């Protein structure tokens, strides 16, 4: 699945 919003993936990686 491709992430349309960069913050989504970023928030997950930040956690």
Swiss-Prot record:
Enzyme class per UniProt: oxidoreductase
Keyword Nucleus: no
Cofactor(s) this protein requires: Mn(2+); Fe(2+)
Phylogenetic classification of the source organism: Bacteria, Pseudomonadati, Pseudomonadota, Betaproteobacteria, Burkholderiales
Quaternary assembly: Homodimer.
Enzyme Commission code: 1.15.1.1
Function: Destroys superoxide anion radicals which are normally produced within the cells and which are toxic to biological systems.
Superkingdom of this protein's organism: Bacteria
Reactions that this protein is recorded to catalyse: 2 superoxide + 2 H(+) = H2O2 + O2
Co-factor: note: Binds 1 Mn(2+) or Fe(2+) ion per subunit.
Protein family according to the UniProt entry: Belongs to the iron/manganese superoxide dismutase family.
GO biological processes: removal of superoxide radicals
Protein's recorded name: Superoxide dismutase [Mn/Fe]
